[in-house]
């Protein structure tokens, strides 16, 4: 055939293919128009976190036996445990316990391997501050339980989490 005719046929096939791809993209766009919005109005609406959410660590001072398992399993050796050996009872007495949440990666190893369950993860995720030194929590700050999102009447909670399709 003539080269001009074959180029014209290729041009026609490419035009049809391009129109099909544009149509497929347009159909996907139209299918998303029926869905609910994914974003929420953050300060006024909050999602209720899942049961296994890894938020700020809660620490119970009375349960801790200063075994330092949390320090050994932490990938960045983060918890600082100060203790004193009581010679009369031959046990360690915990003096100070602190975690710097500016460095913590929230892996949950300390909570998982703690033999006395004195560490637990909370649903608190709003840890932002203007000074990074405020992220270093001692045992008093770690012992405070966060206010539950459900109990706050000024915040509308969003219960329906988007389902992940696999």
UniProtKB/Swiss-Prot annotation:
Keywords recorded for this protein, A-Z: 4Fe-4S, Chloroplast, Iron, Iron-sulfur, Membrane, Metal-binding, NAD, NADP, Plastid, Plastoquinone, Quinone, Repeat, Thylakoid, Translocase
PROSITE patterns: 4FE4S_FER_1, 4FE4S_FER_2
Pfam families (UniProt xref): Fer4
GO biological process: photosynthesis, light reaction
Cofactors demanded by this protein: [4Fe-4S] cluster
Chief place where the protein resides: plastid
Cofactor note: Binds 2 [4Fe-4S] clusters per subunit.
InterPro entries: 4Fe4S_Fe-S-bd, 4Fe4S_Fe_S_CS, NADH_quinone_OxRdtase_chainI, NDHI
Matches recorded under HAMAP family: NDH1_NuoI (MF_01351)
Family affiliation: Belongs to the complex I 23 kDa subunit family.
Subunit note: NDH is composed of at least 16 different subunits, 5 of which are encoded in the nucleus.
Designated name of the protein: NAD(P)H-quinone oxidoreductase subunit I, chloroplastic
Protein source organism: Zinnia juniperifolia
Gene name tied to this protein: ndhI
């Amino acid at each position: 055939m003539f080269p001009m005719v074959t180029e014209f046929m290729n041009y026609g096939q490419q035009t049809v293919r391009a129109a099909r791809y544009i149509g497929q993209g347009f159909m996907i766009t139209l299918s998303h128009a029926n869905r609910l919005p994914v974003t929420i109005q953050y300060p006024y609406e909050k999602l209720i976190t899942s049961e296994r959410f890894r938020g700020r660590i809660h620490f119970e001072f009375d349960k801790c036996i200063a075994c330092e398992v949390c320090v050994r399993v932490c990938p960045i050796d983060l918890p600082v445990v100060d203790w004193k050996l009581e010679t009369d009872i031959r046990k360690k007495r915990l003096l100070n316990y602190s975690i710097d949440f500016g460095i913590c990666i929230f892996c949950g190893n300390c909570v998982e391997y703690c033999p006395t369950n004195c560490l637990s993860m909370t649903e608190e995720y709003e840890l932002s501050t203007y000074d990074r030194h405020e992220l270093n929590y001692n045992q008093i700050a770690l012992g405070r339980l966060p206010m539950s999102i459900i109990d706050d009447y000024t915040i509308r909670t969003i219960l329906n989490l988007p389902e992940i399709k696999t």
